[in-house]
Each structure stands twice: as C-alpha cells, then as structure tokens.
C-alpha cells in the first residue's frame, strides 16, 4: 500500500455554545491532577465509509460546541494564581479543531499499515506553548471513504474514565441535535478535602511522584528503533477460558487478562528466576474514597497499585494465585490510603512535584505498566452513523506499557496494545495464546 498523505485543510478554535458559567474562575489542580501525566494523551476512533457518509463535519463540530459548555475545564486554559499554583482558568477559550483529508481508503489502511501514518491523525499539541488549548480534535476524512476522529486532551484535566464519559456525551449531543443532557460532577474541591490537620501516613512523594527514592529513577532507556508496537486480539472465547482457569474465585476480565499478560511477557523476556517483577496498575478511586466520589466526576481520580512477584513464582503460579496477588495490591488502595494521599497534597501544596510518567524510550523491563479502558462503552460512541469500527492506538514507545480496550469487532473480546523490545516480540508471539 502506498504511503498515505494527510493534509490539514482547516484549523479553528471552537468555543462552547452556549458559553459555560465561570467568567474566568481559577480552579487549582487537585493532588490527583498533579500526579497525572503532564502532557497530552491521544485517542483515535475510526468509522467506515458508510458510517462516515452519515456524519457531517459541521454536525460533529456543533455537538462539540454544545458539549463543551458542560465540560468547562476542557474549554479553559492553564494559568497560575496569585499564590503561584497551577490552575484551570474557566474562560471558555475553546478547543482547537482541525479538518484534514487523507488520500486513500480507510478500510485499506486498517487492513495494511495504518500505523505508518497514525501520528498524523491527531493534533500535535505542545504542552509548553502559552495558551495551548487543553482539548484538540482532528476530523480526518479519507478520500475513498472513512473517517477518523483523533483527539488529544491534557491528562491533568481528566483521566480515562472522565474522557470516556466526555466522548459518549459528545456523541449524544451530535445524535440528539442538542437535546438537554446532564452535566457531570465538576467540584474539584469536594473530591480532595484534607483532614485538619492533614496526616499523610504513606510515602507519597516517592510513590505517586518522582522523589529521590522513586522507583521511576531506576528504569533504563531503549533505542527507539528497538521498540515494537503490538496489537493482540483476545476473542471472547479466550477470555472465558481464562476465567475458567481462575476457577471459583470472582475474577474481572481485566484481572484475568493482566495475569495472563504478566506471565507471558515475563516469560518472553527470559528474566532470571530470582529477579522480581511488578506491574503499575491504574486504580479508579471514585468508589474507594470516603465518602465515595460520584462516578460522573470529571477530573482525575486515579492512584496506582503495584502487584509484585519473584519471576520463578509468577511463572509457576496458577492463574488464580496471580489474580490474587493483583487483587490484594489493588485492595491496598483503600479509603485510608486515598485520604493519606489527599492529606499529602495539602502538606506539599507549595512544593514542586513531578509526576512519575515515563518518557518515550523508557524500558520498564522487568516491570510493566497497564491501563484499562475495558469499561469504555464503545457501542455508545455513536454520532449518528453507528459505533466506531476500530480504536487506533497511538505510537507510544515505552517498553512494557500495556493498554486494554474492548474490541470493536467482537462483543466480549478485548484488544491489548503494547510496546515491547523487538528482541522479545517473537517469543511473545509464540506463547501469547497459550494458557500452559
């Protein structure tokens, strides 16, 4: 297949309509926001030619303008208040929208090598540029049929749970032509209220942030030419088989797949049996905090669990045992831990805190990091032409970073996108579907 050329045909800043209330209000980042990646996260969805023909760019943009009025942080900008704190300025400045044309057919691109031009399918935001929009969208139409909606949002605005709600609400706004839709819970101060006096009980400076003792300092680098992006499809029958392996213990799809991936990637890496390996697991804290935070809270509410095992134990253990290690680690992110983290945020309010997000080229080996969008309801992402035919993963060159998303092709199936050292790829391919 010939190289696909993507040409930007239009660029504009789209303001909320109607403008949201706020009048330039300054909202400080919570400690959860400060722990999130200080950068833009791309998300891309594709619709085939028939679905794309039913969607006009104007309708998509009108829906975006309508939904932005209910998500004012995405339409705002970063600023600094009189106390020197990084804040959101809720000023209705708007989102950047690009329209683009790609030569060729989307179906051909998906069947062959869309990865070769995937980084041209979303806006290239610059987090260091003054007044940079916090949400940027690109509508790319293929000349022979097909549409890709690529969006980047700054991670300190919202986590994956929040952005999944935003995307489905945007689709609903287009599909219903502006019918009244609910506003999410937006009160950041209510979800990060410290005790008086604050009493942090854990080493948050070195766990959630890049303190001098942080494990993030120990990871090496890998030449980018050795990074390989992989996509592994787990059909629903395979997922059911994994759950059966766990037996009577209650096991989520995510826990089963993570146990499997952890085992197989560790085996493919051919690590020393005496070495230890851990996984950094994102944990949604909305239902774990005390009191619980509304599920529709728009912002960041994620901390991390760190299941850890010796390689020999991981490879020899049953699936049920590995799931148990994962479940126990996640359970430690409880109400007490979350309140301690909030209290730490108050104690360190004036400190410079660097999140632990990895840079491109980082090699997590012998460890992994995982994020899950399995709960994302792709079937609800219907702008009027039906749900997307594909989720397109960005090129994220970090060895050992995994992302689970629900399959667009098979209900109950899951796609695993990951980057891995090229030297370990063939070994993983040979064993990735083995449950031995």
UniProtKB/Swiss-Prot annotation:
Kindly identify the residues recorded as the active site: 155 (proton acceptor), 382 (proton acceptor)
Q: What class of enzyme is it?
A: transferase
Mind listing the GO molecular function terms for this protein?
acyltransferase activity, transferring groups other than amino-acyl groups; hydroxycinnamoyltransferase activity
Alphabetical UniProt keywords:
Acyltransferase, Transferase
The EC code for this enzyme is: 2.3.1.-
Asked if the keyword Acyltransferase belongs to this entry, the reply reads yes
Which InterPro entries has this protein been placed in? Answer: CAT-like_dom_sf, Plant_Fungal_Acyltransferase
Report the family membership: Belongs to the plant acyltransferase family.
Function, in words: Hydroxycinnamoyl transferase that catalyzes the transfer of an acyl from p-coumaryol-CoA to tryptamine, to produce coumaroyl tryptamine. Serotonin, tyramine, and to a lesser extent agmatine, serve as acyl acceptors in vitro. Can use caffeoyl-CoA, and to a lesser extent benzoyl-CoA, as acyl donors.
Q: Which PANTHER family match?
A: TRICHOTHECENE 3-O-ACETYLTRANSFERASE, TRYPTAMINE HYDROXYCINNAMOYLTRANSFERASE 1
Protein name, UniProt field: Tryptamine hydroxycinnamoyltransferase 1
Q: Identify the species of origin.
A: Oryza sativa subsp. japonica
